[in-house]
């Protein structure tokens, strides 16, 4: 906006982003490319209101983001909610690789038992390097912020951060399969 000669304080921009980012994320979900069937699932930590909260994330074997969810607790219920949401969006995976997290293990076994399916569970920290490295893109943006004040604003801003990260990775389904830059993909969502 400053390039066009319009000077705006940072607080209205922050308020606009809190309103617009959830809508942008919803529009992106409708146009997201399908992901692979071998997922890597992990959680990372984000500081909200001086306390650590848990950002569940999953990527496929190629490094494409499957889904993300910010929760207050790293328990079985939160991991299962994340997993069911990812399955509803992308279908059942064949394999899920996790670290030694007990909550993730319990959630996957619970989904296997309830849905009468057999998702192969692998616990290998070296295969999980893809998702660990993918956390860096989110941390690169959130660490300079020095944490969030409120949980609801953290959820909304992380939706925007993750959406922009997935757009940069090229996961938006483009019309006519034409090659588009990240800025062109963003404009196609926004307008």
What are these regions (language model features)?
Residues 1-191:
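Residue-level recognition of single "structural anchor" positions
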């Amino acid at each position: 906006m400053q390039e066009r000669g319009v000077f705006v304080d940072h607080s209205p921009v922050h308020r606009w982003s809190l309103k617009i980012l959830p809508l942008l994320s919803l529009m992106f979900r409708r146009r997201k490319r399908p992901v692979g069937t071998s997922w890597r699932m992990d959680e990372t930590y984000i500081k909200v209101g001086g306390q650590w909260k848990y950002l569940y994330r999953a990527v496929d074997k190629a490094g494409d983001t499957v889904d993300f969810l910010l929760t207050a607790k790293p328990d079985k219920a939160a991991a299962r909610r994340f997993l069911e949401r990812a399955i509803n969006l992308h279908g059942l995976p064949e394999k899920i690789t996790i670290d030694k997290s007990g909550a993730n293990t319990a959630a996957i076994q619970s989904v296997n038992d309830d849905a009468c399916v057999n998702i192969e569970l692998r616990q290998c920290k070296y295969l999980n390097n893809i998702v660990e490295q993918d956390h860096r893109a989110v941390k690169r943006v959130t660490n300079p912020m020095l944490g969030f004040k409120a949980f609801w604003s953290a959820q909304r801003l992380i939706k925007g951060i993750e959406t922009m990260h997935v757009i940069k990775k090229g996961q938006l389904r483009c019309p006519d399969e034409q090659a588009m830059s990240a800025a062109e993909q963003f404009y196609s969502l926004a307008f």
